[in-house]
């Protein structure tokens, strides 16, 4: 999964390409972070001690009933903030399904980021490189990677998520916790900048006792992208030989974002029927970029899942 700025940047470029003028940019950026926003919720606690285990839910949303959740968002969206959050979320899905197989490959043994924690080191280095290209500064501030919707916009997004998560995954998460997840993400990413290397050195020691190598430093900017990234690679999920490295894939990700947003807007305007919408979006695993039995599942949550809150 790319880091926050890569997701937001790709989504914004896609919106510009289809001539969609954002009215709620923070809502759109929050959507572009997708389920990743849940990973930071009460991150200092162990799973069983969190008010809700949103990091576990975030992992599940990347693999389980992915198409069903996207359709739920599309069906229950009503306000402008909800519309733009949903469009951003579609872009997160689009970018992950294009980029993530390459991330897995490039961080596998023998590849440039094959070291422990390499997955995160590659993603934050790509974030830093793109931010430097856009702004001249490789340090990625939280305002650029994960701005927080406020007021009524935040309330409407949290209500949308509550309804869709309950419907698709059977988990009754409070709107307060869902709203808090955006603040936790923002606050944590504010700590993950280290212009002069002091914080990075502290985190380098800290993560030896908390999470392991790369758990924290794999999210710290600025970071330098290695120059020997492969252009030819093997898809880890399918075994297919692929051509086109990180920057070619970013263009592909943007095009997929454009396709999915155009489909959503067409559906809301009554110009694209449900069957074509479903076929366009698919129901892919965010991890493999392919459809799996788990990602395609449309089954209602069982009783145990429906009662799960933490």
Outline where the language-model segments fall.
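N-terminal leader/auxiliary helical segments
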Residues: 1-86, 93-310
């Amino acid at each position: 999964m790319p880091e926050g700025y890569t997701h937001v940047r790709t989504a914004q470029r896609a919106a510009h390409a289809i001539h969609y003028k954002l009215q709620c940019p923070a809502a759109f950026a929050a959507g572009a972070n997708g389920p990743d926003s849940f990973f930071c919720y009460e991150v200092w606690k162990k799973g069983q001690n969190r008010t809700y285990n949103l990091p576990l839910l975030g992992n599940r949303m990347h693999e389980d009933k992915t198409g069903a959740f996207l359709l739920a968002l599309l069906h229950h969206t009503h306000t402008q903030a909800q519309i733009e959050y949903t469009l951003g979320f579609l872009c997160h899905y689009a970018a992950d399904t294009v980029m993530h197989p390459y991330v897995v490959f490039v961080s596998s043994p023998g590849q440039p980021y094959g070291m422990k924690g390499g997955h995160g080191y590659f993603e934050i280095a790509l974030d830093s490189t793109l931010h430097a290209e856009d702004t001249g500064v490789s340090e990625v501030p939280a305002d650029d990677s994960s701005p927080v919707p406020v007021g009524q916009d935040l309330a409407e997004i949290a209500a949308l998520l509550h309804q869709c998560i309950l419907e698709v995954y059977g988990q009754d998460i409070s709107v307060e916790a869902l709203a808090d997840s955006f603040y936790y993400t923002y606050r944590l990413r504010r700590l993950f900048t280290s212009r002069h290397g002091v914080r990075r050195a502290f985190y380098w020691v800290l993560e030896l006792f908390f999470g392991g190598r790369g758990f924290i430093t794999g999210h710290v900017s600025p970071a330098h992208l290695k120059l020997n990234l492969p252009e030819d690679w093997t898809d880890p999920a399918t075994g297919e030989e692929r051509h086109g490295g990180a920057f070619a894939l970013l263009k592909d990700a943007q095009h997929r974002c454009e396709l999915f947003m155009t489909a959503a807007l067409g559906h809301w305007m009554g110009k694209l029927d449900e069957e074509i919408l479903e076929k366009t979006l698919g129901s892919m695993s965010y991890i493999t970029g392919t459809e799996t039995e788990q990602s395609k599942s449309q089954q209602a949550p069982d009783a145990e899942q429906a009662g799960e809150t933490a």
